[in-house]
């Protein structure tokens, strides 16, 4: 979210010329990422707005996440590109304050949205009946408002401490000399949400797996009951079971309670039902793997994109002798920004309704 800076004043014209190709490459690469992030998040927002089928409280959270990531792409990334390429801040301290404020608030808000979505999905799968009544547009709006308010409260202290010291006009950074402020902001913006997300998605996976198994067992029991036929005549009873027809003949006799004769006969119908049951088990297993893959992508992308940056933020503050290069600092910041590009892909690519909505938008069928 913040960058170190350098100056080109001590470089010769030849050195500047030699560095020009790399600067152009960096500029084009980062501009491409910013454009892709803007486009994809715009598609998600437009799809939810124009597609009636997507007007669901759960998707309102995804829409709000897309808006947040869109703001990162439009208001944060372009200034960062200029800062990296120029290697100094040339837009004044007022604009610097605005940029840092938007940067920290939007990135924090994007992360907290992931926590809100995880909480929403957890309650939807573990308390489906009760939560279905509470899962209204108003409820989604309250969750979104809470996320934004918390983001502002988490982001303000670092900006406040920035003005307690002196800063150069050609730099735009958050100082790493207030350990309390850094711990407060990093734990509030990342580490606490990370723990919450890990716990929630672990519980979601376990709950989803249990639900799949219960549904499969319920289907098998239902098939057994539907396939049973009872015929009674006086003291005789015949029981036919579709899975493997069993003939049970019970006769009353003074010397014995009953005599049983068992014979098993395979039938085409029983084999057909067995085949259907096997297919359902296969489908259930496929869905379980798909759910695990989706959760793995969500968690993996989040951790890979943001963990290195926030580890750096803590290490640089706690360890006075620990230094990090400008290039590495920029790379870690943009690795975090990359999460704003990945979010809309992960949260919509596995949803058929979103896929159809995207196709209609691209083909201009609205």
UniProtKB/Swiss-Prot annotation:
Q: Which residues lie on this side of the membrane: Extracellular?
A: 1-24, 82-96, 160-178, 316-327
Does the UniProt entry include the keyword Methyltransferase?
no
Gene3D superfamilies membership: Rhodopsin 7-helix transmembrane proteins (1.20.1070.10)
Cite the GO molecular-function annotations of the record.
Answer: G protein-coupled serotonin receptor activity; Gi/o-coupled serotonin receptor activity; serotonin binding; serotonin receptor activity
What is the membrane topology listed in the Swiss-Prot or TrEMBL record? Multi-pass membrane protein
Extract the SMART domains matched here: 7TM_GPCR_Srsx
Q: Where is this motif: DRY motif?
A: 120-122
**Alphabetized UniProt keyword annotations:** Cell membrane, Disulfide bond, G-protein coupled receptor, Glycoprotein, Membrane, Receptor, Transducer, Transmembrane, Transmembrane helix
Report the transmembrane regions from the record: 25-49, 60-81, 97-119, 140-159, 179-202, 292-315, 328-350
| UniProt-listed CDD domains | 7tmA_5-HT1F
Q: Where does serotonin bind?
A: 103, 107
Span(s) of short sequence motif NPxxY motif: 343-347
Per the record, the similarity remark reads: Belongs to the G-protein coupled receptor 1 family.
Which protein, by its recorded name, is this?
A: 5-hydroxytryptamine receptor 1F
